[in-house]
Amino acid sequence: MSIPRLKSYFTILATVLVLGQAVSAQAAELPDFTQLVEQASPAVVNISTTQKLPDRRVSNSAQMPDLEGLPPMLREFFERGMPQPRSPRGDRQREAQSLGSGFIISADGYILTNNHVIADADEILVRLADRSELKAKLIGTDPRSDVALLKIDGKDLPVLKLGKSQDLKAGQWVVAIGSPFGFDHTVTQGIVSAIGRSLPNENYVPFIQTDVPINPGNSGGPLFNLAGEVVGINSQIYTRSGGFMGVSFAIPIDVAMDVSNQLKTGGKVSRGWLGVVIQEVNKDLAESFGLEKPAGALVAQIQDDGPAAKGGLQVGDVILSLNGQPIVMSADLPHLVGALKAGAKANLEVIRDGKRKNVELTVGAIPEEDKDLSMLPKSGVERSSNRLGVAVVELNDEQKKAFDLKGGVVIKEVQDGPAALIGLQPGDVITHLNNQAITSAKEFTEIAKALPKNRSVSMRVLRQGRASFITFKLAE
């Protein structure tokens, strides 16, 4: 072998060794979940529920067709193939069953799961890892967070370690154990896709988003970090097909345990409440309110006699922080407020009329049901038209008092123009235009005449009791 060939040989050999070491290093970095699963599985349970429903298929003879007009042979033929009527007292009951998951958080038998797993159940059955089955008692449930606390009789039961969901970061490995489609102790894995996610109609939970495969039956089961600690409760998926599509959501264990402790001690959950309706600040709204960039929560509506009203918060305020914690998106505010107790102090940093201001108020307790404002009644006051393409009338004193409005105008007619383009409708109430409160139809017309062109202008609109700010631009 010549010297040049010998050098080439050693060069190739060295390259192969380096590549082999790199591959081995990458393989070594991949997690092994074996020990985690072995230690955690005994405390993960299968939950089955039974709900008794009335059998409404045939309840009385009024549901039977009239066969009296048929010949005897035909009548006998049809009667043989039809169910016989029963009296209402003879109605049978049928059962609806569902499956889910849960996990043990105390040695004496307390179990966490989802509210939707056990909702409306007449009987809850828990199957442990050793296949034994026990009836569970519902201690309490919180539909707003989708958390439920159960209790089974037992002692020295296996218990899961609880972590801190606030320490999670996007990109970290996570593991789920549950009973998808009834297959007990199924293990799936993935990564944290995002934290602090907000979902429609889920205002009080900053969800953990993952790509862990979650299917029917996984709900209520634990989500683990690599230390084997529970960091969340698997709750729901985003799907267009009905099956898993790579986007799943878990309730942070910090939130779940706060709910659990309140249910255990008081049977219900208390949350902080400001009494406001807020909306996202987009680019156009940021320009309209003089903000450097889209951020914060825009106050679109304030409930009469609520904490915000008593504390001096105003419609049009943009809330930038609460007790020093920044409000990057509007969805951040309900999470932070909900975590406060009634009576706690809340210091809000807001933008009002283009200037920063601090507003301090006392947090209230969230009511069982939010006040429902109905569509405002029509007024018979004289019309006023304007360059926006709407005909408006003023609110009378009775309407202002009934709906706690100091002013505003009702749209009676929408014509071709900017109003039609932004979706305004007859019956909508306009309370603010270009950050100015409207007290009369005449004032509305005057403000409309002075609106700037080619710049975002805000308008506060009340529709069916719900207020929001919208923006538009007037062309040259």
Swiss-Prot record:
One of its GO terms (cellular component) is periplasmic space. InterPro entries: PDZ, PDZ_sf, Pept_S1C_Do, Peptidase_S1_PA, Peptidase_S1C. Pfam families: PDZ (PF00595), PDZ_2 (PF13180), Trypsin_2 (PF13365). One of its GO terms (molecular function) is serine-type endopeptidase activity. Residues 263-354, 360-465 form the PDZ domain. Residues 1-27 form the signal peptide. PROSITE patterns: PDZ. Keywords: Hydrolase, Periplasm, Protease, Repeat, Serine protease, Signal, Stress response. The active site is at H116 (charge relay system), D146 (charge relay system), S219 (charge relay system). GO terms for biological process: proteolysis. SUPFAM superfamilies: PDZ domain-like, Trypsin-like serine proteases. Its EC number is 3.4.21.107. It is an enzyme of class 3 (hydrolase). Substrate binds at G217, N218, S219, L274, G275, V276, V277, I278. It catalyses: Acts on substrates that are at least partially unfolded. The cleavage site P1 residue is normally between a pair of hydrophobic residues, such as Val-|-Val. It is found in: Periplasm. Belongs to the peptidase S1C family. Might be efficient in the degradation of transiently denatured and unfolded proteins which accumulate in the periplasm following stress conditions. This is Probable periplasmic serine endoprotease DegP-like.
